Swiss-Prot record:
Residues 63-67, 174-184, 236-241 are cytoplasmic. Catalyzes the dephosphorylation of diacylglycerol diphosphate (DGPP) to phosphatidate (PA) and the subsequent dephosphorylation of PA to diacylglycerol (DAG). Also has undecaprenyl pyrophosphate phosphatase activity, required for the biosynthesis of the lipid carrier undecaprenyl phosphate. Can also use lysophosphatidic acid (LPA) and phosphatidylglycerophosphate as substrates. The pattern of activities varies according to subcellular location, PGP phosphatase activity is higher in the cytoplasmic membrane, whereas PA and LPA phosphatase activities are higher in the outer membrane. Residues 202-213 are annotated as: Phosphatase sequence motif III. Belongs to the PA-phosphatase related phosphoesterase family. Pathway: Phospholipid metabolism; phosphatidylglycerol biosynthesis; phosphatidylglycerol from CDP-diacylglycerol: step 2/2. Residues 94-102 are annotated as: Phosphatase sequence motif I. Residues 22-52, 92-158, 205-210 are periplasmic. It is a multi-pass membrane protein. The record marks 213 as: Stabilizes the active site histidine for nucleophilic attack. This is Phosphatidylglycerophosphatase B. It comes from Haemophilus influenzae (strain ATCC 51907 / DSM 11121 / KW20 / Rd). Pfam families: PAP2 (PF01569).
Amino acid sequence: MFKRLSLYTLLLCLVPFFIWGISYQWHGNSQLTQADYWLYLLTETGSVPYALITCVLFTLLFAFLFKNPKQWILGVIVMGISVIATQAAKTGAKALFEEPRPFTVYLAEQTHSTPENFYKNDRTLRAEIAKNFYSMDAITPAWLVHHYENETGYSFPSGHTIFAATWLMLAVGFTQLLGNRSFKAKLLVVGIAVWGLLMLISRVRLGMHYPIDLLVATLLAWLINSIIFAFLKKKAIFVMK
């Protein structure tokens, strides 16, 4: 199980490594295409409140992996613990490191200010500043202005990435733990892996994160879920029979 969790973690880590490899850096929205709107819709599946719908959907999609309703209910509790623990780790790291997002750095550069001055304001004022600046930018579409307005927190690590990576770890972990090797189980893992990869790409493409934010968030999800599944392996109700 540990090897399989690590394998899918490595898969997600290919995104930041590839971005570094091609020396891609976001600096404004001049390269936006129609495809980026679809990435925005996908990234919203990890944004509040839509992330709650995503969680409910995944808990239902995971149901067939479990042998009985009791096992599924316990599995849902584990899923909740995993999501809460990883989001708590992300929130703590953001508060500790206070790294600005790419789009806020760009805003500061263009207004001859500094990211530090931007983040001295409360969230309401930061949202207003971001909205006013990017609304005047002809190349930034309204949907992205709205996204910036709602995402004026810190950058490191990526909350959307840790959310997607956590659900991939849960899919891989439970299929391994419960010994479900069915085509449906494989399809579930592959589907979530593709969703996760696109989520990571969207965060850099839309000016929300740097590659290091994605890498550390993915590794945090791997670490926390590796601990969770190492614990679950010792519990009889989840042991393969």
